[in-house]
Amino acid sequence: MIKGKSRTEVKALAQYICMSAHKARRVIDQIRGRSYEQTLMILELMPYRASYHIFKLVYSAAANASHNKGLNEADSFISKAEVNGGVIVKKCKPRARGRSYPIKRPTCHITIVLNKRSNLTKK
């Protein structure tokens, strides 16, 4: 049986963030399953560069929830948070004696899904 999306599920997606997926996952693992307010407090205090991008994405997902679905941000929690690897931007850096060194800039795609706390089904 295929389940349909719940009406209270809100998604935000950030693509081509110039950072490796491994570094972004280290921050995402800390906020998965937490409430909206608790997530914002954690992300403000984390010293990692990825926390700024994830903070903006969580804030955007909450704005989507309140504007599009009319949900309250205080009742929402992060039901799904994932980081996938994106394309690798390849460049060449010129070096001495006509040589060149490759530069690889990894990118990642971050997905945040907010859900309403009262819709959490207990099994």
Swiss-Prot record:
<keyword id="KW-0687">Ribonucleoprotein</keyword>
<protein>
    <recommendedName>
        <fullName>Large ribosomal subunit protein uL22c</fullName>
    </recommendedName>
</protein>
<dbReference type="InterPro" id="IPR005727">
    <property type="entry name" value="Ribosomal_uL22_bac/chlpt-type"/>
</dbReference>
<keyword id="KW-0150">Chloroplast</keyword>
<comment type="subunit">
    <text>Part of the 50S ribosomal subunit.</text>
</comment>
<dbReference type="InterPro" id="IPR047867">
    <property type="entry name" value="Ribosomal_uL22_bac/org-type"/>
</dbReference>
<comment type="function">
    <text>The globular domain of the protein is located near the polypeptide exit tunnel on the outside of the subunit, while an extended beta-hairpin is found that lines the wall of the exit tunnel in the center of the 70S ribosome.</text>
</comment>
<comment type="function">
    <text>This protein binds specifically to 23S rRNA.</text>
</comment>
<dbReference type="GO" id="GO:0019843">
    <property type="term" value="F:rRNA binding"/>
</dbReference>
<dbReference type="InterPro" id="IPR036394">
    <property type="entry name" value="Ribosomal_uL22_sf"/>
</dbReference>
<dbReference type="InterPro" id="IPR001063">
    <property type="entry name" value="Ribosomal_uL22"/>
</dbReference>
<keyword id="KW-0689">Ribosomal protein</keyword>
<keyword id="KW-0694">RNA-binding</keyword>
<dbReference type="GO" id="GO:0015934">
    <property type="term" value="C:large ribosomal subunit"/>
</dbReference>
<dbReference type="GO" id="GO:0009507">
    <property type="term" value="C:chloroplast"/>
</dbReference>
<comment type="similarity">
    <text>Belongs to the universal ribosomal protein uL22 family.</text>
</comment>
<keyword id="KW-0699">rRNA-binding</keyword>
<dbReference type="InterPro" id="IPR018260">
    <property type="entry name" value="Ribosomal_uL22_CS"/>
</dbReference>
<dbReference type="GO" id="GO:0006412">
    <property type="term" value="P:translation"/>
</dbReference>
<dbReference type="GO" id="GO:0003735">
    <property type="term" value="F:structural constituent of ribosome"/>
</dbReference>
<keyword id="KW-0934">Plastid</keyword>
<dbReference type="Pfam" id="PF00237">
    <property type="entry name" value="Ribosomal_L22"/>
</dbReference>
